[in-house]
Amino acid sequence: MTVAIVDFRPDHAAAWAQLNTTWLIEGGFAIEAKDRVAIDDPQGVFLDKGGRIFIAEKDGEAVGCCAMVPTDDGVEVCKMTVTPAARGLGLARRLLEACEAAARQAGAVRLYLETNSALKPAIALYESAGFVHLPPRPTPYERADVFMEKRLQPSRTRL
């Protein structure tokens, strides 16, 4: 078994759409307008804005993903999921670490995310990675009721 975290390529578009649609539906969440745009146009929503999308591959198959996009004061981490069959391999943590490393390299001082209180394993992952809870705030997502951040010290090395 080979697992890897790779940058999004155009040939990942169908897997990106499937991964994100599946976690929303299986979680009992509506696919909101902002979700639809991100699912249908990852290039425009993330990459063209200076963000990154990471894909977790297991034996060459896309089994997870996570995106990051610059914000006014850091980077927002979003659209993280790993298929049920690939859970337990540490891929969600590796995806989150890839986002954090890229954010540090870009000089970001803050990671921010929004999630739902029903997603207990995700919240536990974020807490274990050093994220702290924030007070509720306005959000375009109806499902978002948990807000978290992690303050970063920028990387001292440049690649």
State the predicted function of each range.
Residues F8, T22, D40, V109-A129, ...:
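C-terminal "cap" of GNAT-fold acetyltransferases
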Residues D7-C78, T83-A85, L96-A98, A102, ...:
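Acetyl-CoA-dependent GNAT
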Residues I31, R87-G88, R110-L111:
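A generic structural signal for short
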Residues E61, M80-E97, A101-A106, S117-A124, ...:
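Conserved glycine-rich acetyl-CoA-binding loop
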Residues T2-A4:
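Extreme N-terminal starter segment of soluble prokaryotic enzymes
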